[in-house]
């Protein structure tokens, strides 16, 4: 598995969860 993919996914998830709802 490429390590770059999960890292990008986790960063995207963090950004999405940090967005004000």
Curated annotation (Swiss-Prot):
InterPro entries: Hydgase_assmbl_chp_CS. This is Uncharacterized protein HI_1390.
């Amino acid at each position: 598995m490429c390590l770059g993919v999960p890292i990008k996914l986790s960063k995207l998830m963090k950004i999405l969860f940090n967005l004000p709802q």
